Each structure stands twice: as C-alpha cells, then as structure tokens.
Amino acid sequence: MTKKVKKRIYKNRSNIITLTERHVISESHVFFDECDRLSLKAKNLYNATLYVQRQSFFNPDVKFVNYYDVTKQVQMLVDKSFKSYFALLKKKSKGEYDKPVKLPRYLDKTKGRFVVPYPKDAISLKTAGFVKLSKTDISIPTRIDKDLIVGVRIVPKGNHYIIEVLYDVVKPTIEVDYSRVAFVDPGLNNLMTVTSNVFNPILYNGKPVKSINQLANKNASKRQGLRSPWKPNTKTKNKDRVQQVIFPRLESDKSKLTRSIWSKRSNRINDYFHKVTTNLMNHLVLHDIKTVVMGHNVGQKQDINLGNFTNQNFVNIPFTKLISMLEYKCQLAGINFVVSEESYTSLCSFVDKEDICKHKEYFGNRVERGLFRTSLGVLINADVNGSLNIGRKYLESIGEYSNELHNQLLNYMVNPKKLTISI
C-alpha cells in the first residue's frame, strides 16, 4: 500500500479499528518499578491539571483551559473527562440519563496511579520487533508492523501493569445482508445461545465462568474475614509497634491478596471470553454468516433482582466485554454486527409468532428448567426460543423479517449442541 493511498484511507477514521497488543508487567518484572514510577508521575500531573480545571469550574474568573493544542496526553485526558461530565449533565437535563453526575475526582495522593499514554512520536521503533518508550529503559517486543503502531499505554491494574501497544487496522467493507443470519442470547448457564437459519443451535457453556466467579468471591470473602491475632487493647510491651507497624502491614498484605484474587479472576474470564468468541467466529465464517444480532438490555445488571445467589453470578459477569469482543471480531471478518434490545423475548413464543411485547397471558410458558412449551404443546429449549426472538424482534423492527426466513429458522431450531471450551 502506497503512502498516498494509506493516507486517504486513514483520513476517514470510520474505516479504522484500533486494537491492542497486551504485555503483563508483574511485580517481579524488570520494568515494574519504572512503570510504577511513571504511573505515579502521571497521577501527580492528572491531579495538578484537574485542580486547574475544577477551579475554573467553581470560579467564573478563572479561564477554562483547553488542552487540545497541548501534546501532553495526560492533560488531554483530564480535558476529556470534563467534557464527558458536561455531556452527561446535558443528557440529565433532557431526561436521557438518570444516574448521579459528579465532577471528576482527585486520585489518592499515595496509592493513586494513572494511565501513561505515549503517542507515536514519543516511542522509538528503530529496533525491528521492539517498541521503546522515549526517555525510559522500557523496551517491549511486538509482533505488530511498525507502520501500523499508533501509540503505547501503561495501564495500572492493582498489583500489576499492562503495557498496551496500540495499532490501527483497516476494516473490510461490510455489506448489510440478512439472507444468512445468526442470533446470540447471552446468559448464565449458557453463556451464549446461538441460533441461525443455516445451522443448528449452539449453546456455549457458561458454568466455567460461574465457577471462576464463585471461586473469586469465596477467596475474597475469606480474605476480608481475616482477623489479626493482635488486638488494639492487648497488653504488650510493644503495643505502639503493634498498632503503628504490624496492623498497617497486615492490612496491606490483605489488600494485596484481594487485588491478586480479582486480577486473576479478570484474566481468566477474559481468556475464556476470547476462546469462546474465537470459536464462534470460526463457525460463523465457515457458514458464511452475513449478519449477527446479539441481545442486550442497557443497565440490565443494575436493575435485576433474581436473589442473592443469582445476583452474585450475574452482576459479576462482564457481558459488555463479551459483546465488545464479538463486535470487533465480526468487524474484522466483514460481518454486520447489531446489538438489539431483548425485553420479553424469553416470554413470547417464537413458534407461534407471538408479538414480542408485554401480554396478560402468553401463548407459551416455561414448564421446567431449560424448556419452553408452545401453545401446541411442543417443547423446545428455552434459551433457543429467546435467541430466535431476539433476531425476530430486530428484523421485524426494520422490515426484514419474512415467512421464508421464519420457516428456515424453524427447520434449524432443533438438536441444539452444547459446547464447553476448556479454560
């Protein structure tokens, strides 16, 4: 690709998707101390810039600073956070946002850390296969073509850092076609229920994610329940040392263990999500799927009330992350990806073509765990019924649903296959 053609394509950012290559920097890594030092300085710069912006907000005489002409990326992030704050205020005034809106807050003076962004002109790519951050000793191996790299970020993650190499990829042209479709319903026991008009349903097992969550919750609760054998009123010769040195040290160790638990949990869930979505993408490409419709209700994790045990699992599963993974993989494969609202899709009967909305009485009902009975007494998988209704609801809303497509979906709604991807 010539520079002239490349410049013309990159001018339109809608053709571009930015991806990351991640490198984990643990506490034992040779670059950990330097990453920590840089992140601490970024935090100080963030707080200093935030102070100026907050003063301009409270005091009309102080000029509001716009950092778009400043090359310092950290200061631009502060400016971005304030613009987001004002945008949310505007939405709230129109009734489009119902959650509290607060000013950006200062980061903790000692424990606080902040992202360190390096634009392309602040990194060196002279050594083939390596990215070096300017004025540091940090040099990271990379498989990315140096012409595609647009920057690097050092991201604090509690007990470790992630160095992200950012690179741009040109998205293939996506043609909207509803002749070969797939519908995805996210859930708990079945992480994703996938239906289509060209292949039989696939149920991706969600129990590995539940077990990861339960183990993390169990271990974290144990750590929170730990109590020191020393008590503040204990009569001892070294009482001052116990209160001033040993107590804080024990609390610090407990916090490190807790951060380690949640960090490991997050990494394991990310790994499983990537494996599941990659497996699904291979299946979609194999069957030449043109459009994927995935169900999701905005705020569903915050508004549900399914009991303590279910909430512990459901609320902690990052479905938004699962959706974003599948979305960018579909974009790279040239598949049209749509996220659709899914209310009442599990209550209405797909076989009976029941209108997907609230009814006093429904044509079908769930008779036992995992099964849905239609008005004709036919038993089908409940998640398959919900998945098919997600696609039907969206396609009907845009006028692309036909009797021919409905009959195709009926032919392929039987014999669902359950898949468990190894962790």
Protein language model features and the residues they cover:
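Nucleic-acid substrate recognition interfaces
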Residues: 1-423
